Swiss-Prot record:
<keyword id="KW-0175">Coiled coil</keyword>
<dbReference type="GO" id="GO:0030674">
    <property type="term" value="F:protein-macromolecule adaptor activity"/>
</dbReference>
<dbReference type="GO" id="GO:0120095">
    <property type="term" value="C:vacuole-isolation membrane contact site"/>
</dbReference>
<dbReference type="InterPro" id="IPR013923">
    <property type="entry name" value="Autophagy-rel_prot_16_dom"/>
</dbReference>
<dbReference type="GO" id="GO:0000407">
    <property type="term" value="C:phagophore assembly site"/>
</dbReference>
<dbReference type="GO" id="GO:0034727">
    <property type="term" value="P:piecemeal microautophagy of the nucleus"/>
</dbReference>
<dbReference type="GO" id="GO:0005737">
    <property type="term" value="C:cytoplasm"/>
</dbReference>
<feature type="coiled-coil region">
    <location>
        <begin position="58"/>
        <end position="130"/>
    </location>
</feature>
<dbReference type="GO" id="GO:0032258">
    <property type="term" value="P:cytoplasm to vacuole targeting by the Cvt pathway"/>
</dbReference>
<dbReference type="GO" id="GO:0034045">
    <property type="term" value="C:phagophore assembly site membrane"/>
</dbReference>
<dbReference type="GO" id="GO:0061908">
    <property type="term" value="C:phagophore"/>
</dbReference>
<dbReference type="GO" id="GO:0000422">
    <property type="term" value="P:autophagy of mitochondrion"/>
</dbReference>
<dbReference type="GO" id="GO:0016236">
    <property type="term" value="P:macroautophagy"/>
</dbReference>
<dbReference type="Pfam" id="PF08614">
    <property type="entry name" value="ATG16"/>
</dbReference>
<dbReference type="GO" id="GO:0034274">
    <property type="term" value="C:Atg12-Atg5-Atg16 complex"/>
</dbReference>
<dbReference type="GO" id="GO:0042802">
    <property type="term" value="F:identical protein binding"/>
</dbReference>
<keyword id="KW-0472">Membrane</keyword>
Length: 150
């Protein structure tokens, strides 16, 4: 019986396909792609520093530092969001696995109860048949006594 449960759990895990998890994965991929694009843009900003002259260097540097600070904050918030989404995905996967385990145990319990019901119905039929035979014999005995006294 233990092997049956393990086999059922393995089958449930293999058959598991959660569209919500797939969409979460797609969202994660899109956000990682956005992050890569922003990093590439940040690299472009640092490469274009050679053509500045005199006072423009300071204002250009300030603009780059501002942009860098903004992008770093955004990157940090996106990384936190990614971490949070990964935790949500892990929790949902755990809940899904727990639900599948409950379904499997419920199915097994249902099968056991169905077998018990079948056995009890069979036993009931046998008891009714024995009782009817006994009652028939008693009736025949009474009838023979009545016929014998007449």
């Amino acid at each position: 019986m233990g092997n049956f449960i393990i086999t059922e759990r393995k089958k449930a895990k293999e058959e598991r396909s959660n569209p919500q998890t797939d969409s979460m994965d797609d969202l994660l991929i899109r956000r990682l792609t956005d992050r890569n694009d922003k990093e590439a843009h940040l690299n472009e900003l640092f490469q274009d520093n050679s053509g500045a002259i005199g006072g423009n260097i300071v204002s250009h540097d300030d603009a780059l530092l501002n942009t860098l600070a903004i992008l770093q904050k955004e990157l940090k918030s996106k990384e936190q969001e990614i971490r949070r989404l990964k935790e949500v995905i892990a929790l949902k996967n755990k809940n899904t696995e727990r639900l599948n385990d409950e379904l499997i145990s419920g199915t097994i319990e249902n099968n056991v109860l169905q077998q018990k019901l079948s056995d009890l119905k069979k036993e009931h039929s046998q008891l009714v048949a024995r009782w009817l035979k006994k009652t028939e014999k008693e009736t025949e005995a009474m009838n023979s006594e009545i016929d014998g006294t007449k």
